[in-house]
Amino acid sequence: MKAQRSFGLALSWPRVTAVFLVDVLILAVASHCPDSWQADHHVAWWVGVGVAAVVTLLSVVSYHGITVISGLATWVRDWSADPGTTLGAGCTPAIDHQRRFGRDTVGVREYNGRLVSVIEVTCGESGPSGRHWHRKSPVPMLPVVAVADGLRQFDIHLDGIDIVSVLVRGGVDAAKASASLQEWEPQGWKSEERAGDRTVADRRRTWLVLRMNPQRNVAAVACRDSLASTLVAATERLVQDLDGQSCAARPVTADELTEVDSAVLADLEPTWSRPGWRHLKHFNGYATSFWVTPSDITSETLDELCLPDSPEVGTTVVTVRLTTRVGSPALSAWVRYHSDTRLPKEVAAGLNRLTGRQLAAVRASLPAPTHRPLLVIPSRNLRDHDELVLPVGQELEHATSSFVGQ
């Protein structure tokens, strides 16, 4: 992986035009200042020139993909806001909906006219009841291209689909310390540990978050019973397309949506969090988010993000966002690491820091409807021949110590 340059220029025409008009306004005000302010050397005028220069630099110079003035404004807003209220926005109570001729009950969440549903993807060792499930691949993998095909389903157009993968490292102690994993049954954390002979099973869970704007699907809604029925139809169709390829898929109910919220937050307690410029500080440690350079989004990179060679990392949350750009699917990715201490530089090598946007990165991974994208990062087109896959196995063997006495 290779990180992009820390500093750059944001020279889009709307931005340059806006900055030019602001500079003209500043200089006009400076030139009309009273003579008592000008003194003998046009002090007010040169102060205006300096202010205009500073505004221009802050508006067009970008740092890690965001302009300096935007990063500062976002950080100040997050720092002054209540993290609990910010992260809880959109996490409204969901309702269960079943179509008239549908088979599954799907949980649907609504907020500000936007809808969200969730699909859980598993390794499928025990297929869902009532389904003739078989796995075509010996290794459970989620093909990203197959997920991207669900963005447009006949008359239904989805705003985006997020692939959210949560991996918790460590043994029984690490699992019990994470309050977000209470829904994972206790028997799943049992392990036999002996001094000098310890094998720890990492646990991974993967969800697909489907986002829909009803205003873009007026014709589709008119052909169905309700707004929820339209999203449920798209959810069921994507489940049928994915189930049995190389993994198992099932829709998430309303009660399970709350559990997904807790799992994605990991050990992050919103009411005890403090947004920082480079990380989130909370009572249980640090949460640090990075975005991935678009050209580096490959199967190997996604696997490396989930399993960093760092004992400090306890939980990893990887989000791959699929959207439609000029008629073709585009993808972007970011990752969040939870650690007891600040992350070493080796873990962040090749990644781009989400400076000033740490709280937005956490909220963007939650299955909560939003009126506009909370996190805008560089993306690339998803090509038809991209063999991009994401592992979805729930248990990953990870040796954490040497074997003694063999």
Curated annotation (Swiss-Prot):
Function: Part of the ESX-5 specialized secretion system, which is responsible for the secretion of EsxN and a number of PE_PGRS and PPE proteins, including PPE41.
Keywords linked to the UniProt accession: Cell inner membrane, Cell membrane, Membrane, Transmembrane, Transmembrane helix, Transport
Coiled coil: none
GO CC annotations on file: cytosol; plasma membrane
Provenance organism: Mycobacterium tuberculosis (strain ATCC 25618 / H37Rv)
Protein name per the record: ESX-5 secretion system protein EccE5
Annotated compartments: Cell inner membrane
Keyword tRNA processing applies: no
Family from the record: Belongs to the EccE family.
Membrane protein topology class: Multi-pass membrane protein
Transmembrane regions: 9-29, 43-63
Major location category of this protein: membrane
Record InterPro entries: EccE_dom (IPR050051), T7SS_EccE (IPR021368)
Gene name of this polypeptide: eccE5
